[in-house]
Amino acid sequence: MWEVIIMKTYIGKIHLKWCKNCNVPLLGRVCEVCGSKAEEVKLTPPGDPRLGFQYDMDFINKILEEEFGAKNVLNGKIILLNKIPGNEEAYEIIVDGEVKYLIYFDEDKEKWKVKLKLNGAKDLMEKGAYKKIIKIKNDVVEFLKNRKGSVLRPGIVEFTDDIEEKDDVIIVDENDRVVGVGLAVVSSEDIKNMEKGKVVKVRFFIKDNEDYKPGKIYDNLEEAFDLMVRANEGVIDNYERNAIGFIKNTYEKIKKPVMVAFSGGKDSLVTLILTLKALGKDIDVVFIDTGLEFEETLKNVEDVERHYGIKIIRLRGENFWEKVKEYGIPARDYRWCSEICKLEPLKKFIEENYEDDVLSFVGIRKYESFNRATKKRIHRNTYIKKQINALPIFHWSSLHVWIYLLREKAPYNKLYEKGFDRIGCFMCPAMEMGEMNKIKREFPKLWEKWENVLREYAEKHNLGEGWIKKGLWRWKHKRQ
């Protein structure tokens, strides 16, 4: 069962706001299209939501349909996915300027599940939900209104026969109006045999004088994204101006050859664009091919070269598939792969091509992790002593990055349109189970190659199938 890990502090300022009139996310105080005042959006820390594409919309729609029977719930809306800390992969789904659903990957059931917010349930019923519904007496509604409590068996009029223990359910009154959502503590089969007792632990229930109106619907995402870009134009201009100023000032102070580390990801692409605008093309752009990259990433390197008329230097480390036989399975607490496949080829390149220090502009953002948030904006690489790292987009949120890329019509990696949060090695041990499940589904041959390595290792070291199936290989010290 998914549980949130409470964060005591945010990594930084939460930039996300919303224009309820245009129904688009905002980064400033006012919508630059209609002039409406931006409204706050409550998020779980660290609060760095990413933009949802059509794949994400279809994926979440499918989960909602499987759970509640409602179809195409999110169509015509901009959605954001806020990844939140927990013992399993989980996202808050932001629609119409509020969190309406929380989806999480249930590792025991190996499927995605949903936790409901009240307005999310209202949207589901509007779209024809017919599963996991409990109808209660109107006098019970009046009793539960404006207070927390539970739905008891005597107060239930009827219920659907598909409810399992620990399912989220929609609570409606005798007029089929959504009045609450909560967690079923028993199954439909149990309810049939009960005369009294608790059935639903209520999470949210209607209050007096509540008014709910769904947001504007767009014909397509392209139209919605275009308006979102225009609604944030001035904010993005300001962030671009500050980042370019940082790059120019840093270069003037340090006066060393310039390199941009390009990974095929969105953050490094923004950093490359800004550096080209600030300093021109007389820079080195370096891509490290670990041998574990997706084909889409390798293609993106070519697309970026062609789009900006530059040559990207490709570095290659030692063969991972040979080294894994020597070092064993890489893990979160045993990251030999980063050193051998990434850092060593870069270190060798810098040693051979620069007499002195090199100024490297890197797409690190503080919102990515607490570890990254502690970095100084200009610092020397502790592993590669000649590399001085500078971070132009350190204070940018994920939404700043996406709006900038859309405005620039930049050739971003198409993996993002397949629901990927990050771009990197396809079998990185830092992944969650939901991410691995997606790679297995989208890239079966690639994942099969890795599972064959895991299986061979497991047999050699007397590790059970659960070590692979439950993702225990991701920790070196969980192998026993």
Swiss-Prot record:
CDD domains: PAPS_reductase-like_YbdN, PUA_archaeosine_TGT. It holds the Pfam family PAPS_reduct. Residues 131-207 form the PUA domain. GO terms for molecular function: oxidoreductase activity; RNA binding. Keywords: Oxidoreductase. SUPFAM superfamilies: Adenine nucleotide alpha hydrolases-like, PUA domain-like. In the C-terminal section; belongs to the PAPS reductase family. This is Uncharacterized protein MJ0066. The lineage of its organism: Archaea, Methanobacteriati, Methanobacteriota, Methanomada group, Methanococci.
